[in-house]
Amino acid sequence: MAHSTPCSQTSLAVPNHFSLVSHVTVPSEGVMPSPLSLCRYLPRELSPSVDSRSCSIPLVAPRKAGKLFLGTTPPRAPGLPRRLAWFSIDWEQVCLMHRLGSGGFGSVYKATYHGVPVAIKQVNKCTEDLRASQRSFWAELNIAGLRHDNIVRVVAASTRTPEDSNSLGTIIMEFGGNVTLHQVIYDATRSPEPLSCRKQLSLGKCLKYSLDVVNGLLFLHSQSILHLDLKPANILISEQDVCKISDFGCSQKLQDLRGRQASPPHIGGTYTHQAPEILKGEIATPKADIYSFGITLWQMTTREVPYSGEPQYVQYAVVAYNLRPSLAGAVFTASLTGKALQNIIQSCWEARGLQRPSAELLQRDLKAFRGTLG
């Protein structure tokens, strides 16, 4: 993966696919509107302001350009200057390094911001579903201003884009790590050995990672935020071996879901990890994340994929026939610890959300289980 040229003190190194232009004016009407009422994702005092400034190249704006959002300054991110606020970007301090990955709604790059490693996500103008792209951008900002060891933090965000840019907005995030839990589970490291011959995650490591994720969920739920796309690919592992929940493009705030029983909002996500009530189009609750965690814990334990077959058949069977991944393997049946782990997983993916544990209860059970291992 090629790196860009080094950055100067006053410029942004951009990937090759960005075309340089001599002068681009951002029209006053070019600020991306929220597809939903502003109070759903941002307090009204943090709503986008209009400020038509020029920029010399895509993703670069003058150093003293006006803030895109108005409001008080949240606590600063560790390692970054005290004056920084999440609702504005100091573009002169951004230096892109290389692309980390891309998906349906945009691309993620490794970069530095004020000399600190960060990840930068650009949300594209998805021609097939522009509204979905907009929702993804605003949903990512549900966690703006929040800080927790097991959540990837939003450092800064901007809706500012040049006229010819394909980006709806830019989000600068804490760099959570180069490795995802998915890569660790399935050993996606280009090892020549077949998966069946490779070392499995130890039970202790599974519990450590599980507690990291549940701690993150407990914090999110305490802030009335649902992730709604929890899976190993959306869990980063830092250099300090700490799991951090990332990718909040499907997240929702609980207050936005209340009172909408007749017309639940569209919820994205991954069908293999979606709770039955979500597949049925019902209103989401924190228990939907607990279900997704149960599937994730099963993956950590077995290193297998949850289902095979056509997605529509799997979704129907999950709802109609209570289909779940198999718990018949030796890892669950050969020991008392395996049986205890089986019970935890089974409780997480109960058909009815009310029967699943809360994140708080799950945290307590996992800690107690870890204590029995000595």
UniProtKB/Swiss-Prot annotation:
PROSITE patterns: PROTEIN_KINASE_ATP (PS00107), PROTEIN_KINASE_DOM (PS50011), PROTEIN_KINASE_ST (PS00108). Its EC number is 2.7.11.1. SMART domains: S_TKc. This is Serine/threonine-protein kinase-transforming protein mos. InterPro entries: Kinase-like_dom_sf, Prot_kinase_dom, Protein_kinase_ATP_BS, Ser/Thr_kinase_AS, Ser/Thr_Kinases-Pseudokinases. It catalyses: L-seryl-[protein] + ATP = O-phospho-L-seryl-[protein] + ADP + H(+); L-threonyl-[protein] + ATP = O-phospho-L-threonyl-[protein] + ADP + H(+). Transmembrane segments: none annotated. It comes from Moloney murine sarcoma virus. GO terms for molecular function: ATP binding; protein serine kinase activity; protein serine/threonine kinase activity. It is an enzyme of class 2 (transferase). ATP binds at L100, G101, S102, G103, G104, F105, G106, S107, V108, K121. SUPFAM superfamilies: Protein kinase-like (PK-like). It comes from the Viruses. Belongs to the protein kinase superfamily. Ser/Thr protein kinase family. Residues 94-370 form the Protein kinase domain. Keywords: ATP-binding, Kinase, Nucleotide-binding, Oncogene, Serine/threonine-protein kinase, Transferase. The active site is at D229 (proton acceptor).
